[in-house]
Regions:
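Cytochrome P450
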Residues: 1-395
Length: 395
């Protein structure tokens, strides 16, 4: 493949990256881009191996190619996602004191209430934008509820999170409006932390302030970075997961029929969507030492993209990988990473998706999508839809 065959910023690539991924796996499993100064690993065994090998693959410069997001200060906005052990171990342990599985599971009833709050008016309308009216609102409200953001502020915070992720065609970095949105979000969360230090409330922000391991506590900057990560990464990826599930269900009516006829199949719908068209397409690492893969040496300090979306379509692991199949074994998907950096928010994302799709299936007999009016998000890391007009037939 030529040096410019794989451009992760290219709008055409965003429309359908999977044929390119297939060529990379076949022809260039260790791919070099001189234009953007990175290597890319596309095969499942290489991607999962890199996730698990923290001695050779570093997160310390962030997980994005964007020049303004790449560097030794990436942890200021990407939290422990941009740290290596032992710093990563320390911070993840402290965050885990507040962001517990018990806290997540205790939110189930509230997540269902939030889901219905947005779903029922949309269903009553009959035709609505699946993203704008539903899938974009539920995860934002859930994250906001969890961390303590007032209802009145949530729409604006979601708008700013969208600005951080979006790239105009031909733009290869966080645009000025995205930088401004990042600074606004950081300022907002800093004020919220200041307020909680004065008066605690029953939310994750207060729990993070109080998190303590042998006298070690999180600083304000560390708490703000984690809150920023939650709203930008946690919120947006779950929105895209819901939109992708709804869209690919529509594209594959025989598969869609399975959860619509048996709600116990909803977890299969979630997991196959995570495999087939994952929200998080690629994550960056930096070589901590010379790495030899497929006879090619990657020098210390070089940037390496782990192509998660490609790994999930690897024919060496998944039979007929380009088929959307709710009956397949998805246990080897790498959508949430692997090893020490396995996504801490995975249980929450899965819970939200199962509840949201479950409430839809319980009320909707069938639905249609307007593909001509569909709008795709253009982002280097995140794949999904910004608009998905849909019309439902109620049960």
């Amino acid at each position: 493949m030529t040096s410019n065959s794989f451009n992760p910023y290219d709008y055409e690539m965003h429309e359908d990256p999977y044929p390119t991924y297939a060529r990379l796996r076949s022809e260039a499993p260790v791919y070099r881009s001189d234009e953007f100064d990175f290597w890319a690993l596309s095969r499942h065994e290489d991607v999962i191996g890199a996730f698990r090998n923290v001695d050779a693959y570093s997160n310390a410069f962030g997980v994005s190619l964007d020049p303004s997001a790449f560097g030794p200060d990436a942890h200021r906005t990407m939290s422990f996602l941009a740290l290596d052990p032992p710093k990563h171990t320390r911070m993840r342990s402290l965050v885990g004191k507040g962001f517990t599985p018990t806290k997540v599971s205790a939110m189930e009833d509230r997540i269902r209430e939030i889901t219905l709050q947005h779903l029922l008016p949309a269903l009553e309308a009959g035709t609505f934008d699946f993203i704008e009216d539903f899938a974009g609102k539920v995860p934002m409200d859930v994250i906001s509820e969890l961390v303590g953001v007032p209802t009145a502020d949530r729409a604006e915070l979601r708008r700013m999170a969208d600005l951080v992720l979006h790239r105009d065609d031909g733009v290869y970095d966080v645009p000025p409006e995205g930088m401004e949105a990042s600074l606004t979000l950081i300022g907002y969360y800093q004020e919220m932390v200041d307020e909680r230090r004065k008066v605690r409330t029953d939310d994750l922000t207060s729990a993070l302030i109080d998190a303590d391991i042998d006298g070690d506590r999180l600083s304000d900057d560390e708490i703000v970075a984690f809150l920023f990560l939650m709203v930008v990464a946690g919120n947006e990826t779950t929105t895209k997961l819901l939109g992708n599930a709804w869209y690919w269900g529509w594209r594959n009516p025989d598969e869609r029929a399975k959860p619509f006829e048996d709600a116990n199949r909803i977890p299969n719908w979630v997991e196959e969507t995570l495999r087939y068209d994952t929200s998080s397409q690629m994550l960056l690492r930096v070589a901590r030492q010379p790495i030899v893969s497929h006879g090619i040496t990657i020098a210390e300090g070089e940037r390496i993209l782990l192509l998660v979306g490609s790994a999930n379509r690897d024919e060496a692991v998944f039979v007929d990988p380009d088929r959307y199949d709710l009956d397949r074994d998805t246990t080897k998907l790498v959508s949430f990473g692997s090893g020490r950096h396995f996504c801490m928010g995975a249980p929450l994302a899965r819970l939200e998706a199962r509840i949201a799709l479950g409430e839809l299936v319980g009320r909707v007999a069938d639905y249609d999508v307007d593909p001509d009016a569909m709008v795709r998000v253009h982002s280097i890391n995140v794949r999904g839809l910004a608009s998905l007009p849909t019309t439902v037939v109620l049960r």
